[in-house]
Amino acid sequence: MRKIVLLLALALLLPAWPAFAQGQFRVLVLAVPNRYHHDYTVVAKPRVEKMARQHGFDLDWSWNTAPFDGDLSAYAAIMLLNTPGDALAQGQRGALEAYVRAGGGVVAVHRALIFNPPGDWPWFERMIGRAFRIHPMVQTATVRIEDASFPATFGLPARWIWSDEWYEFGPPLVDGLRTVLSVDESSYDPTRIWPGQVARGMGREHPVAWYHAYDGGRVFVTALGHPPAAYDDAAYLQHLYGGLWWAATGRGISATSD
């Protein structure tokens, strides 16, 4: 009995163990519902929360931009989940810039790649790396791995059948973009679009996911993620976590590609 009491007393004197009581890093997910992207949240929130439990990281989920009025330094990465930069007010935009310049990581998912109006926040557009042009209707296509050394590709087949909105982009806005995944335009119809709109595709080089170092931080971008069912797909969630892991830690890139 005396031994148990002694052990309890010693335990009270010991400092807390945050590395065990808390996750390996902390992530903020910004998921502001918008006109075309709101149904996905019912699926995405519990699945991303499960991802956090599975991989042992702390997660804060926000439906609004209020966290950008406070201190972002506790976050190893910020995920802009179908939430574009124009959702942020001017002061909040400055907070994101300061966060990245201090070494923070950003994961931009699908709708986050579209900024309206174009040219209103050049820093954010350069962070994304490419300017969105248009997309055809949702179709099934073949996705190719372009960089098997990057963790957002780990576990994916060399040719992956996926259904999504295949965003088209202009040329790179910055140097150093590393393409992770591309879509094979011969596997779908890039011109299948709504009346009054024109889509032509991008040709052989049609990136749909990439990463780069930007203004002191790490940025992973994936154009995939429109269908709500995507967030219930194990392969897609592995793709998403691989990019998040790198953005948060800088780890995971293999020395060689298989």
Named regions from a protein language model:
Residues 86-158:
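A glycine-rich, often tryptophan-bearing local segment used as a flexible ligand/cofactor-contacting loop or short
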Residues 133-215:
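Catalytic beta-strand/loop cores that center a nucleophilic Ser/Cys/Thr
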